[in-house]
A protein has these predicted regions:
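GT-A fold catalytic core of metal-dependent nucleotide-sugar glycosyltransferases
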Residues: 89-148
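Catalytic core and acceptor-binding pocket of nucleotide-sugar-dependent glycosyltransferases
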Residues: 161-179
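Extracytoplasmic/secreted proteins, especially bacterial periplasmic and envelope-associated proteins
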Residues: 46-49, 94, 160, 164
């Protein structure tokens, strides 16, 4: 996301992401000043530094760094139905539930941030929407149905798009064959 600002881009990596506008024509939506991050397992030094950098560059946000020990304070997902879910699948469900219930910005815990995230609020206002995401051009075969990236999401609370995404993912995980 910020590679063009701080360092050269590796030409061998074809991983370009573009802005997508979800739910246009909303004129007064506000993204809450909350950043959500989640990590399951031992906290690597790199991840800890990423989280500290997010806090440092975004002092005007409440940064909620969640783990399996404190995630229940903010969302109530029934993991009893998901005994075989991977940590990545759990994180996906958590991100969609948090964004739907509370709004704010979801940022993967291992994301390196170089600047304040207020630019998201400006983009949302500029495009008259209540949410923000990137889509991956390389994986999108039909522009009407883009493949969204989920490492950086933003929305006002109660956006049905994120509730629907949660519900579809939950069904897919429940249908996954048990090994």
């Amino acid at each position: 996301m910020y590679s063009n600002k701080k360092r050269g881009v590796n030409a061998a990596i074809d991983n370009e992401a573009d802005l997508i506008v979800l739910n246009p024509t909303i004129t007064d939506a506000a993204i809450p000043k909350k950043i959500w991050m989640y990590w399951e397992g031992p906290l690597a030094g790199f991840v800890k530094e990423c989280v500290e950098q997010v806090k440092k560059t975004n002092p005007n946000y409440v940064v909620n760094f969640l783990t399996p020990n404190n995630v229940k304070e903010f969302c109530d997902i029934d993991y009893g139905r998901l005994k075989h879910a991977t940590p990545q699948q759990k994180a996906d469900l958590i991100r969609f539930e948090l964004i739907y219930q509370h709004g704010g910005i979801w940022l993967d815990a291992s994301t390196i941030v170089y600047e304040n995230l207020d630019w998201i609020e400006k983009l949302v206002a500029q495009h008259q929407t209540n949410s923000f995401a990137y889509y991956r051009k390389k994986n999108t075969t039909c522009p009407d149905f883009p493949v969204l990236e989920n490492w950086l999401l933003a929305s006002s609370a109660k956006n049905m798009f994120f509730k629907s995404w949660f519900e579809e993912l939950l069904k897919a995980i429940e249908l996954t064959p048990k090994v």
